[in-house]
Each structure stands twice: as C-alpha cells, then as structure tokens.
Amino acid sequence: MVRTINETFLKACRGERTDYVPAWYMRQAGRSQPEYRKIKEKYSLFEITHNPELCAYVTKLPVDQYNVDAAILYKDIMSPLPAIGVDVEIKSGIGPVIDNPIRSLQDVEKLGEINPEDDVPYILDTIRLLTTEMLDVPLIGFSGAPFTLASYMIEGGPSRNYHNTKAFMYAEPKAWFALMDKLADMVITYLKAQINAGAKAVQIFDSWVGTVNVADYRVFIKPAMERIFAEVRPMGVPMIMHGVGAAHLVNEWHDLPLDVVGLDWRLPIEEARARGVHKAVQGNMDPSFLLAPWSVIEEHVKGILDQGMKEPGYIFNLGHGVFPEVNPDTLKRLTTFIHEYSKGQLAK
C-alpha cells in the first residue's frame, strides 16, 4: 500500500519553494511526553526499539500531538553497534556505556559487518509499518556519524573533552583510518537499508565533532563522510548533516554531496549563508528557549524564521534535542505558530 504524504518537508530539503516553513524537532519523540514516560516505566530504550508496534507508536506520537511535518524514527545512534561486535548498555543518567572500548588496531580488526535484515530486522519492520500503514508525513531515518560513534567506542561512554579519542586519532592513524572505514561501511549499509524499508530522508548526527578543528576534520574525518554521502546519494532521498557546537565546520559540510546543512544556535542562519552555505538549511533554535514564557519564544522564533525564509529550502528545527522539562503544549503551539506566521510571510 502506498500512502499519500505531505511532502512540504521533502520539498524544503530539495531547496524548493514551499507554502509554509516545515518543522520537526530533534528528540520530538520521547522524554517530554507523559505517554512516553509511562512506556519507559516498563520498557528500556532497546526494548522499545525491538518492538516494532511499540516503536512505531512512539515515533508517530509527536506527529499526532504537535502536527510536525516529519517523523524521525525512534531509536538511538548506538542501535547498530552490537551488530558489529560492540557491547552497548544505555545507563540511566549516564548514556551509552561500552565495556570493550577500542584501544588498538587489533580491536578494530575484530569488528564485524552489519547485515541489517538479519541484525536489526526490528528497525526495518518499524519503518515498514510506519510508512505503509501509519504516517502521512515523511519518515526520517538516521545514523550516528563515524567520529561520534568512534568517540563512544574509544572513550567507553560520554566524555567532556574526548581526549582519548583525539589521542588515538593522532597517535594511531592507521588504526584510526581503519576504524573510520569500518564505521563508514556500517553507516552506508545501515542507511541504505532504512531507505529501502521506506525512509524518505536520512540524517547523520555527528554530536561531538565540534571538538575537532577544521584542519583535523579535513584529514581524519571528512574522507569517511564524503564516501558515506557519495554512496548513499544514488538512493535518491534528501540527506541531512547535523552536529553540535560545529559552526566552524559548516563550510566543510557544505562541500559534501548532501542536501541539508543542520545548524545549532551558535551560528545564525544569515551568517551561515554569508559564509557561502546555500544548500537547504535546518535549524536552529536553542531548546532552552522552550522553557521561557510564550511571548519570549514567539519573538525569538520570528527572528529565526525571518532569517530562514530569505532563501528557499528552510526547515525549522532546534539546534539540539527537546529537554525532558519542556511542556508538550509548548511544542504544539510552536508548530502552529511556525506554520501560520511563515505562511503569512511567504504569501506576501
């Protein structure tokens, strides 16, 4: 069964003009929703993602509640790592913890390959369920980027400074590039499988790449990213790049064969465009504003929209994920305001 979907988000990704600015929010499915918190009382994140019906429900919930223009599959960037031999546990209040961190070329060589239909069939089944029976907006698939995945695999968990990761990168370049190649292979296969299952766009999250300077990015990270985007591009769906604290890297991303450059709040949209970023742009509200009074939110969002709408190809989003403390009613009101305000401005 082929469902008719609202393609406003996809049009914006392709740099086309739209009647209004499409919006979705990173971590829109999850921590701020009472319904989700009740589910989490009974099930862990990995238990939810292993249950296609439950995972599809969680993924669709913000579409119904907030009227956003895209759904993003509920899962974690660590979800594919067990398939290649990495033991991951999501610990409450900490995040992903890995008991067998990478320390040598031999550790890298032990990593296997992912076969999505065998290793993560529940993720693909969730995508099929959502796209054939449930959603009337596009579904975004996603993956972590090699650098961010490598940082968890080397540090053994979250880090404030990523000293071990960068030390490994500098001191063991042969092992580093072997790891980047292994992870790039995994990301390519994983994203292609999500697209084949029905994802209409994909986003790559490089959450911690902002810790790397431009010169090191070009040498140690960009080659893997170029290969990922080049090999996934023939699949014909929009591809989005997003990182946090990475304003100094947006021109490097713009050079990649992708469609949408994601921005966080540290770099104004108009400044990114002044630097030469003229692909579609996604962003870039500081999620902290969602805890402010509505009058403050409205004025701030107007400013972001006014910048974003100056060129076709703009998607409203946050610069990072929704906080648990955010009132779901605020997100619903925000989506309505984005749609109505942008529609009025674009009609002028």
From Swiss-Prot:
- Enzyme class name: lyase
InterPro entries from the xrefs?
UROD/MetE-like_sf (IPR038071), Uroporphyrinogen_deCO2ase_HemE (IPR006361), Uroporphyrinogen_deCOase (IPR000257)
Gene Ontology cellular component? cytosol
What's its EC? 4.1.1.37
- SUPFAM superfamilies, alphabetically? UROD/MetE-like
Q: Does the keyword Nucleotide-binding apply?
A: no
Q: One MF term in GO for this entry?
A: uroporphyrinogen decarboxylase activity
Q: Which residues bind substrate?
A: R27, Q28, A29, G30, R31, F46, D76, Y152, S207, H320
Coiled-coil stretches noted in the UniProt entry, renumbered to this chain = none
Name its cellular compartments: Cytoplasm
Q: Which PANTHER family match?
A: METHYLTETRAHYDROFOLATE:HOMOCYSTEINE METHYLTRANSFERASE RELATED (PTHR21091), UROPORPHYRINOGEN DECARBOXYLASE (PTHR21091:SF169)
Report the protein name in the record.
Answer: Uroporphyrinogen decarboxylase
**Could you tell me which species this protein originates from?**
Bacillus cereus (strain G9842)
Organism lineage reads as:
Bacteria, Bacillati, Bacillota, Bacilli, Bacillales
